[in-house]
Amino acid sequence: MDRFIIHGGHRLRGDIVIGGAKNAALKLLVAGLLTSERLVLRNVPRIADITTMRRLLEQHGVTVEDLEGDGGTLAVGGTITNTEAPYDIVSQMRASILVLGPLLARCGEARVSLPGGCAIGTRPVDMHLKGLEALGAEISLENGYINARAPRGLVGERIILPFASVGATENLLMASCLARGRTEIINAAREPEIADLVACLNGMGARITGTGTGSLAIEGVEALHGTTHRVMPDRIECGTYACAAGITGGELRLIGGRADHLGAVVRALEEAGVEVFQEDDALRVRRTGALRGVDIMTEPYPGFPTDMQAQFMALLSVAEGASMVTETIFENRFMHVPELNRMGARINVHGSSAIIRGVHSLSGAPVMATDLRASFSLILAGLAAHGETILSRVYHLDRGYEAVEQKLARCGAQIERVRE
């Protein structure tokens, strides 16, 4: 397995191009299952999860063509010949569950393995299944698989989600596009990635209104057609590199970054002593003074994103004073804490909250990544630490971040990937 070797203590300065959003691109690829025509996606991130999703779509019989030879522009199209999503692929990535709704809507049946992905709590799929049942699907669980049928097709219904689940919103949204009649999704998630999915689906001929309001209305259509769509910039990647500027006391220009996608993160950064400026095509982030402790609580959008919690905790570990981080979205999302403490951080976990008492400096140490976002929190700590940090199991990082070592090295970081 690959490792990163990081020698910390260097201020980062320079430009970093923010790639396409992982959490948008995966769902946009799945949307290709809703039409027999070609869906062309531009600004696709070159990450491991995209490779896994391509394998899954090809398993269903559709073609995923690399139009420019570098993975950045993909075309999805063709006939669905297989409605089973097998365990060996689905277990690698939780987003695989999102093929369930489109397969059911388009083919009237689907057999999808229960999902895998990051080891963050149980992350149940109950809301996906209950919502599809409300649309008329017949669903059973057998031997680790979801068996779903809609022999008479899906029919629009009013669905109230008990929690603003991103995945359930996306699955039901895509399924409803081809359902008969009108579907309403109440308490729908409002993330920018969902707005990006809606824009693409409407470009394919769907009739969806209510983006960003928490209540989506979908008028079903008989068929969708192809289109060309550009994937939005990755707000989590942008927020992560903003933390890199903050923790190293440097200045980065994050090309493609948008403050309007990162409101809660920008406010927390500014409260912590990091300056953030929106320029025409970029976000400029810099720190010149001391970091200050702040309290944050993860919440559904537009609240502070759970996918930024680990990175922000690394930043707070070297801030003056005490901070508290409360995780309300996922259980078991503090697995990075013991590794940060190995580097000299002072963090104590109490239930769903972590108390961080800032230290003057961190020390390099051998550490191990446990999930996608936690892996980057350890890189951030390594960039700020004295001495050498060796980060193992970086395959977690490769699932969601593109060209990490190259982007950081161009801005002055001493980071090297060692392949084994």
Swiss-Prot record:
Which Pfam families does this UniProt record tie to the protein? EPSP_synthase
Per the UniProt record, which residue ranges are transmembrane? none
Any GO BP annotation: UDP-N-acetylgalactosamine biosynthetic process
Catalyses: phosphoenolpyruvate + UDP-N-acetyl-alpha-D-glucosamine = UDP-N-acetyl-3-O-(1-carboxyvinyl)-alpha-D-glucosamine + phosphate
The modified positions for 2-(S-cysteinyl)pyruvic acid O-phosphothioketal read C118
Originating species: Gluconacetobacter diazotrophicus (strain ATCC 49037 / DSM 5601 / CCUG 37298 / CIP 103539 / LMG 7603 / PAl5)
List the HAMAP family. MurA (MF_00111)
Encoding gene per record: murA
Give yes or no: UniProt keyword Manganese: no
In its UniProt entry, what is this protein called?
A: UDP-N-acetylglucosamine 1-carboxyvinyltransferase
What is any one of the record's Gene Ontology cellular component terms?
cytoplasm
